[in-house]
Amino acid sequence: MKKIIITGALGQIGTELVIKCRERYGTENVLATDIRKPEPHSPVKNGPFEILDVTDRNRLFETVRYFNADTLMHMAALLSATAEKKPLVAWDLNMGGLINTLEAARRYQLKYFTPSSIGAFGISTPKVNTPQLTIQQPTTMYGINKVTGELLCQYYYVKFGVDTRSVRFPGLISHVKEPGGGITDYAVDMYFKAVRKGHYTSYINRYTYMDMMYMEDAIDAIIKLMEEDSVKLKTRNGYNLSAMSIEPEMLKQAIQVYYPDFTLDYDIDLERQDIALSWPDSIDTSCAQEEWGFDPKYDLPTMTKVMLEAIEKKQKEC
């Protein structure tokens, strides 16, 4: 990977992916793109940036040509909870952007990455230690988009030889960007509220287990997968990833190690709760481990320490 374009670069994953890729491959070799301008203090502003609507195919192709890209990391998407509120917008953005970026990868012979999600599973999926290959019948527009995306990526690999790669991300925890419309974002919000208010009201019920992972592990996983020799990848699209399976009470207890007076109560959002219940409690990540060495470094205690320290630092700087 020598010249990388990242779409959705101002999103939760995109922002940190841009930072890491610029550190690893050189600032001028990573073009960040998004549909809006970066905020004045955005870390993305330290290098090349273009406003890009991924549903505009001609503009996308033009951007690939002028930057002379060899890799496209497509992160632009409407997330799970937001997609349920705006299903037609979600279809147009998530599927239109996906097919356009896949076409760009085919036409210009790009290495290609896009994330899938645990949202690609549904209520008929085995809930504990969910296998890599299993039933996928999601009940949300976001999940339908993700399953379709996995199939399209595999189609472009088999039909056209495009070097497509993707992973099924769990909930991702980060202090760089605040919650952005995902079902698992309660966990991120709980950390911020613990520092700022000492209390959090969760919209997800206790004992609702979902897979999670610290963002640094997620970014490292993308880069590790993209740098792996193509011949070693048997699964290729939609690798299960997770670092931990947690529920709100577990997160509360981890926070109370540092904030003993932190309190948690519940005001359940039934729509988001139903979506959470349709997802696995835990997933099997053995394919990612065996094929390209997936090995997350952060568990719940280490993630909690890092998250709280980073948010405290932000508070002092405000």
From Swiss-Prot:
One of its GO terms (biological process) is threonine catabolic process. It comes from the Bacteria. Gene3D superfamilies: NAD(P)-binding Rossmann-like Domain (3.40.50.720). InterPro entries: Epimerase_deHydtase, NAD(P)-bd_dom_sf, NAD(P)_epim/dehydratase. One of its GO terms (molecular function) is L-threonine 3-dehydrogenase activity. Belongs to the NAD(P)-dependent epimerase/dehydratase family. PANTHER family: L-THREONINE 3-DEHYDROGENASE, L-THREONINE 3-DEHYDROGENASE, MITOCHONDRIAL. This is Uncharacterized epimerase/dehydratase SERP0194. The lineage of its organism: Bacteria, Bacillati, Bacillota, Bacilli, Bacillales.
